[in-house]
Each structure stands twice: as structure tokens, then as C-alpha cells.
Amino acid sequence: MADAPGLIPIFLLGYLLSTECAVFLDRENATKILTRPKRYNSGKLEEFVQGNLERECIEERCSFEEAREVFENTEKTTEFWKQYVDGDQCESNPCLNGGICKDDINSYECWCQAGFEGRNCELDATCSIKNGRCKQFCKNSPDNKIICSCTEGYQLAEDQKSCEPAVPFPCGRVSVAYNSKKITRAETVFSNTDYGNSTELILDDITNSTILDNLTENSEPINDFTRVVGGENAKPGQIPWQVILNGEIEAFCGGAIINEKWIVTAAHCLKPGDKIEVVAGEHNIDEKEDTEQRRNVIRTIPHHQYNATINKYSHDIALLELDKPLILNSYVTPICVANKEYTNIFLKFGSGYVSGWGKVFNKGRQASILQYLRVPLVDRATCLRSTKFSIYNNMFCAGYREGGKDSCEGDSGGPHVTEVEGTSFLTGIISWGEECAMKGKYGIYTKVSRYVNWIKEKTKLT
């Protein structure tokens, strides 16, 4: 037993030698375990890593052609290259309103959701802002895309926003060229007003005005408006939709051309049994200018709610049918009539112009040359405070508080027009007022938006 301790080291050495295959690996396998793999990329580039991409482009700087050899696909190579060259431009999420960012070299592109546009999808592209950049009418499609359209006689231009003439003499356009300085009128453009929500614009149109319209005034307003006071001489062909109505004795009212066969005017201008002659293309009523066209009226249609015995100026609008169609040219051109919504929108632009051959000052002489005048829209509260007479929902006020400029006697029935992006639309009919151009008083006009459906229905050309 004394020799037993010497056997223990021998036993342990034999055990270790017998387990060598489990402890020691060959060189190749040991290298695989001991070598730390390189984490050459942990970002978006990993999705592009294939084959020898690390050797070609990570450990060394590679060219586009070398990267192309790795991917063997131009599209994938391009996507990789955009990030490889200058980093990910989309990392800061520059696209707004749900836009999708696509990286590019030193740049990026936003793919915008429907209803938005701009470099970062920051612009509302619906009709509610600047009319969707449409030059006339705008509508939002079910998928919230803008659809621009034009009034009759126009077609969409190549940009799908502008409207260009589709006929020789489209409505609302002046085609006479002037050598003198440009004539300034009340031209307006679309602003950032919320046109998409027209509730406020037409609220007074849907107010129940039946009770008001059935009230009899204690006294009539002082004047039919048959004048433009403080205006300027129009050039020949500058207001080609303007007409003058002649009775058996003298000129007495104005009107506007709707189309070749129909004129719109004020209902209070009409007297039962009167023979009316319409003169279109007129400029100077004291001279023959060879631009005039004369037509007889064969039918008068006052609005069905007009009743002069109840109120001479409520629903003050009428249509005149001509015996022969007018020949349209640069001096005889219709005024444009939009739908109800846009007629209201155009009126709310706040600046229109009126025209006629009425008196050039209160109780003064009648104008020989056609006059025109810009008149600002007056808010309803101010309008109501300015007079003791009723201002119904089918009327509006326009003019200057300081006086001196207004429509006046002889201008009744003439057009109140708003010029939009170079095309003029009918927004009112000259109706009545107290004196002419008196301080604190305004001209009162028939609100055409209330009657556009009636106008279009009655004046269809067959």
C-alpha cells in the first residue's frame, strides 16, 4: 500500500492523453472559432448585401460598376448606391402628411398622399386652397384629387388648370386689342380663402325670405338705378356683353347678353305692352359706329316670384328673348354665368364693376359714351344700417361710403361683373338706390347666384 500514491500521477496523465481529441482542434476549425466576424454594416445597407459586397465596397471603396457586378441588377445597385455615396436623405423624415420618402443622391423625392403636393407634401392640393389652382372651377374627386373644369365655350389647357377658348368669341373675354395702356378693371385671382366650405357663402341664400318678400314697403326707394356716377369712359369693345334697351321714346335701361338669343335685365325695367328694342355692340349712343346690332324683343320673362305691387325690387330680374340671334364678334360677346356656388364665390371676392349709359352725376345728364366703374362689395351689416328700406337676401350692396361713385339713373338692368383670371362672370344686376353716389349710401343689386339655375333653364338654345 506504501507504493499507491505514486500511481495517481500516472493514472491522471493517461486520462488526459486519452481525451486529447476533445480538447485540441485542428488549425482550420480552431481558426473558425477564434476569428471575430466583422460587423461591416448594421443599417439599411444590409438588405443589399450579397456575395462579395463586403470585399468590393465595404473594406475598400468601390465604383458603381463594381457594385453592379455584385447585385447583377441595375435597379438594386442604384438603390444601394444612393445610400452608399452620401447617406440616407430620408433619415430625417422630410415628407409631411403621410408622404413616402425616396432617397436620391444629395436629394430626395416625396411621394405625396392624395390631396397634398409640394416638395415635402406640405401644400393642401384640394379645392379648399386657392381653388385647387384651377383658373375657373374646381371639384374634389372621391379619392380627393383635384378636377378642374371650365365654363361653356372654354376647354382645359395642357396644364389641366387653365382654361383656353374653344370657340371664336367665348363668354366674358375682351378680344379687341388696344394700342393704348392696358385698361385696368376689377380683375381678381383666387386667394387662400377656404373655397371648399361654401356654407358661409350661401347661407343667406337658404334663409327663409318668403315673409320678407311678401311685405309691402311703406314707400319706394328714391331711384331706379339708371346711372354710373364717377366712372370712366369705356373703350369700344371693352364691355362687349353690355346692351341698351330702347323704348318707344328713349333709352331707359341696360342689360347683358346671355347668349345669341337672350338678354338679362332688371324686371322693374319692363312695362306691360311696351315694345323694346335691344342694341348690342353700342359704345357712343350719339354716333353710328357700325358695330351696333339691333334686335326686337319678342318675349319677356320676369322671374316668377317678381311682383311689383308687393315690392318693386325684390326678385328684380328678367329675361328678354330676341327675334333674331345676335352675331357674336369682338363687340358683341356674352357674359359668363357660373353655377350658384361659384357665382357666390366670385361675388365674395369683393370687387366687381358696373357699366351703363346712365346719368354721370346725380340729377345730371345721361352719358353718351358707355361708362364703367369698379365697386367694392359692402358687408351685409353695413348695408342694412345704411338705409331704412328692406335689403332682402336676394340683394347685395356695393359702392363707396364716401360717395361720389355709384351706378345711377339709366343704368338699371345693367350687369355687375366680377373678372376672374381674365374672364368676366355675371354676379349682379343693377337695381336701385337712394339718390346717386350719396355719402353713406350704396347701390343695391340683385344677387344673381339666387337665379342662375332659372337663367340657364330659360335661356337654353335649341
UniProtKB/Swiss-Prot annotation:
PROSITE patterns per UniProt: ASX_HYDROXYL, EGF_1, EGF_2, EGF_3, EGF_CA, GLA_1, GLA_2, TRYPSIN_DOM
Site entry (Cleavage), positions: 185-186, 227-228
Positions of the Gla domain: 40-86
Residues bound to Mg(2+) 1: 54, 59
Disulfide-bond pairs as recorded: 57-62, 90-101, 95-110, 112-121, 127-138, 134-148, 150-163, 171-336, 253-269, 383-397, 408-436
Positions annotated to bind Ca(2+) 5: 65, 69
GO cellular component, one term: extracellular space
Catalytic residues, chain numbering: 268 (charge relay system), 316 (charge relay system), 412 (charge relay system)
Chain sites annotated for binding Ca(2+) 2: 41, 46-47, 56, 66
Source organism superkingdom: Eukaryota
Entry-linked InterPro entries: Coagulation_fac-like_Gla_dom, EGF-like_Ca-bd_dom, EGF-like_dom, EGF-type_Asp/Asn_hydroxyl_site, EGF_Ca-bd_CS, GLA-like_dom_SF, GLA_domain, Pept_S1A_FX
MF-aspect GO terms: calcium ion binding; endopeptidase activity; metal ion binding; peptidase activity; serine-type endopeptidase activity
EC number: 3.4.21.22
Any one Gene Ontology BP term: proteolysis
Residue sites binding Ca(2+) 3 per the record: 47, 56, 66, 69
Residue positions binding Ca(2+) 7: 86-87, 89, 103-104
Localization in the cell: Secreted
Function: Factor IX is a vitamin K-dependent plasma protein that participates in the intrinsic pathway of blood coagulation by converting factor X to its active form in the presence of Ca(2+) ions, phospholipids, and factor VIIIa.
Record's comment describing the protein's domains: Calcium binds to the gamma-carboxyglutamic acid (Gla) residues in the Gla domain. Calcium can also bind, with stronger affinity, to another site beyond the Gla domain. Under physiological ion concentrations, Ca(2+) is displaced by Mg(2+) from some of the gammaglutamate residues in the N-terminal Gla domain. This leads to a subtle conformation change that may affect the interaction with its binding protein.
Family of the protein in this entry: Belongs to the peptidase S1 family.
Matches recorded under PANTHER family: COAGULATION FACTOR (PTHR24278), COAGULATION FACTOR IX (PTHR24278:SF31)
Name of the protein: Coagulation factor IX
Protein source organism: Rattus norvegicus
Record lineage: Eukaryota, Metazoa, Chordata, Craniata, Vertebrata
